[in-house]
């Protein structure tokens, strides 16, 4: 791929979860070539990584035009992040609020590292657009999901690599119900069903039971949010966070 193709190509941070799967569909609907990037950082719910190829294959099979646009997949070993993170995302510990008010599922520096590595790969591959599922509506207070963080990171990456990357975050200002709605707008019931069955959200990595909203334990914060979002999507309502 040459630099002149960069404006019509994108690299999507694709974990295998609902949000990043929706972002992948969003990118496939807009760009001529879309590559994907995943990270193994020792996450407790690494079953999500096992969902990545299944979802990619299902999307390509179900939506042939998107399949023609779907490019290479990249998987990066980022185990160093897990080794320095004492969080409920990387350790078998109970999920609770930490002393700083953030949930202990927050992995410090995760999205900063993800985007920096994504930019390095995009630079080498001649890709201009980086797409991530960060969201400031359903973000549990994670500071590296904020719009200000992404805007600052875009500036830093462009200065540091003398490039003109564009960081796209299509979910930034929408809730989980609207994320389901966006999936429906992009690919109808077929895409919604693929996301429901083929993606993974549960922090505990539970994939034994298929609920109406997808697989999961049904009790962790991620499952509860996904469940409320799906139910609100079906009813046409917005998701309201509990007090």
Curated annotation (Swiss-Prot):
Its EC number is 6.3.4.20. Its cofactor is Zn(2+). ATP binds at residues 14-24. CDD domains: QueC-like. Pathway: Purine metabolism; 7-cyano-7-deazaguanine biosynthesis. Binds 1 zinc ion per subunit. The keyword Ligase applies. Zn(2+) binds at residues 202, 217, 220, 223. One of its GO terms (molecular function) is ligase activity, forming carbon-nitrogen bonds. InterPro entries: QueC, Rossmann-like_a/b/a_fold. It catalyses: 7-carboxy-7-deazaguanine + NH4(+) + ATP = 7-cyano-7-deazaguanine + ADP + phosphate + H2O + H(+). Pfam families: QueC (PF06508). GO terms for biological process: queuosine biosynthetic process. Keywords: ATP-binding, Ligase, Metal-binding, Nucleotide-binding, Queuosine biosynthesis, Zinc. Catalyzes the ATP-dependent conversion of 7-carboxy-7-deazaguanine (CDG) to 7-cyano-7-deazaguanine (preQ(0)). NCBIfam families: 7-cyano-7-deazaguanine synthase QueC (TIGR00364). Belongs to the QueC family. This is 7-cyano-7-deazaguanine synthase. It comes from Paraburkholderia phymatum (strain DSM 17167 / CIP 108236 / LMG 21445 / STM815) (Burkholderia phymatum). The gene is queC.
